[in-house]
UniProtKB/Swiss-Prot annotation:
EC number: 2.1.3.-
Species: Salmonella arizonae (strain ATCC BAA-731 / CDC346-86 / RSK2980)
Disulfide links within the chain: none
Lineage: Bacteria, Pseudomonadati, Pseudomonadota, Gammaproteobacteria, Enterobacterales
Protein name, UniProt field: Carboxy-S-adenosyl-L-methionine synthase
Reactions it catalyzes: prephenate + S-adenosyl-L-methionine = carboxy-S-adenosyl-L-methionine + 3-phenylpyruvate + H2O
UniProt entry keywords in alphabetical sequence: S-adenosyl-L-methionine, Transferase
């Protein structure tokens, strides 16, 4: 059962850095719906992409799976036999709830839920990889290595879905979309105090990149094609394709 996010509704004397702890995990579904514009659309469209890209006898990786929303969307849309989904997160609280969510939905495609660091996971025989609002929590210097590993582990014709909060090279555009995002959160019932305290906790942990920076990294990793397929304010998702034909 999801609870309403009121974690920051009262003043907090000492704000530390953001962590995906038990308190966050408990309210996460409400929090992300009220904080990330277009989140439900991205989740449902990840399932549509899975229907197009997941191949028989291959694996799908959901790296930074949180409570398993993307994993479940993929699982619902797989049309082939002998596929496997590997869902990974380093938060024990998230993983515990993710396992419950996966177990509650019965489907023929098996899901392995792994508590671990996505940087340590071996990617192999993958037809699809999902990084849904995950890369932004890695140190910028570590992001290229992860994308390189994903590219190498993808089969020809495979796809990476990369969803992120974006920064913008045009400061005027960045300011506009930042303000519109805050309007979105206010419209969803968050107070100025809640918005401010959460932003303070995230500012040293969630470091955003521009779409241009993401595309440059993807090219460097080897992806022959990449494009922004969804955007709402300063949030969006790219798809990157490895050339070749799926076996």
């Amino acid at each position: 059962m999801s609870h309403r996010d009121t974690l920051f509704s009262a003043p907090i004397a000492r704000l530390g850095d953001w962590t995906f702890d038990e308190r966050v995990a408990e309210v996460f579904p409400d929090m992300i719906q009220r904080s990330v514009p277009g989140y439900s659309n991205i989740i449902s469209m990840i399932g549509m992409l899975a229907e197009r890209f997941v191949q028989p006898d291959t694996q799908v990786y959901d790296l930074g799976c949180s409570l398993g929303a993307a994993t479940l969307s993929v699982r619902r849309n797989i049309r082939h036999e002998h596929c496997r989904i590997i869902a990974v997160d380093n938060s024990p609280a998230m993983i515990e709830r993710c396992r419950r969510h996966i177990d509650a939905y019965k489907a023929p495609t098996p899901v392995e839920v792994v508590e671990g660091d996505i940087r340590d996971i071996t990617i192999e025989n993958a037809s699809m990889v999902v990084l849904n609002f995950t890369l932004q929590f890695l140190e910028p210097a570590e992001r290229q290595a992860l994308l390189d590993k994903i590219y190498l582990g993808l089969n020809p014709g495979g796809a990476l879905v990369l969803s992120e909060k974006f920064s913008f090279e045009d400061a005027k555009v960045g300011e506009l979309l930042f303000n519109m995002h805050h309007d979105f959160k206010r419209a969803n019932g968050y107070s100025e105090l809640e918005i401010s305290q959460k932003r303070s906790m995230l500012e040293n942990v969630m470091l955003t990149d521009s779409v241009e920076t993401h595309k440059a990294r993807l090219r460097k990793a080897g992806f022959e094609h990449s494009e922004l397929w969804f955007q709402c304010f300063n949030f969006g998702s790219l798809v990157a394709l490895k050339a070749g034909v799926a076996a």
